[in-house]
């Protein structure tokens, strides 16, 4: 008589731990964990071609990611542009944004910037001009520049990090802000660190050719 397979009885065998879905597939604890949203900036190097920004913004809107600002501008290479996105998402959402951006054909490289990255914004404010001396004093205090001054309105610009811009706007409220235009963040990695790996690789190739 043939003996059966050796080993413990089914009820005595070790069972995989963790929850499973209706199909019996184990649920990854990391995906189930509750992650608090955090605010961060992503820098993407993209090909300078028509429609790239539309593809990126369309991807973000379809996935319903919480994006706070998006800026774009050319780099030292006229064939590429830098897109800086500020998002507020839980950790899995941030990683998902990175993955989805990397899948866009025209995106060359994308990475999350560290907390020490250099970030700057610009705000243009038009305020009532009844107290020009006080307006000028506030402008000077924030290292700003007067762009236009007339008997009824004064327009100034301020550049700086997010906190400085927020503080400046609050300071100008006493005069009555008629209009305001604020850019999103643009950012670069600090020191000798490259903002994207693709830029570092391109620089190294040019050095070899020289």
Predicted stretch roles:
Residues 2-45, 49-81, 86-210:
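Long, contiguous binding/interaction regions
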């Amino acid at each position: 008589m043939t003996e059966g397979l050796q080993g413990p009885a089914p009820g005595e065998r070790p069972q995989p731990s963790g929850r499973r879905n209706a199909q019996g597939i184990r649920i990854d604890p990391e995906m189930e964990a509750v992650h608090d949203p955090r605010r961060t900036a992503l820098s993407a190097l993209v090909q300078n071609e028509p429609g790239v920004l539309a593809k990126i913004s369309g991807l973000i809107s379809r996935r319903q990611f919480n994006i706070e600002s998006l800026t774009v501008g050319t780099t030292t290479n006229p064939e590429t542009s830098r897109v800086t996105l500020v998002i507020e998402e839980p950790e899995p959402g941030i990683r998902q944004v990175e993955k989805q951006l990397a899948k866009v054909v025209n995106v060359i490289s994308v990475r999350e910037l560290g907390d020490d990255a250099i970030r700057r914004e610009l705000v243009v404010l038009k305020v009532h001009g009844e107290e020009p001396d006080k307006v000028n004093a506030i402008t000077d205090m924030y290292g700003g520049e007067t762009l236009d001054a007339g008997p009824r309105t004064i327009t100034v610009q301020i550049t700086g990090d997010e906190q400085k811009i927020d503080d400046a706007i609050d300071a100008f409220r006493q005069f009555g802000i008629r209009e305001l235009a604020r850019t999103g963040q643009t950012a670069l990695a600090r020191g000798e660190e490259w903002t994207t790996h693709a830029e570092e690789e391109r620089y190294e190739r040019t050095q070899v050719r020289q």
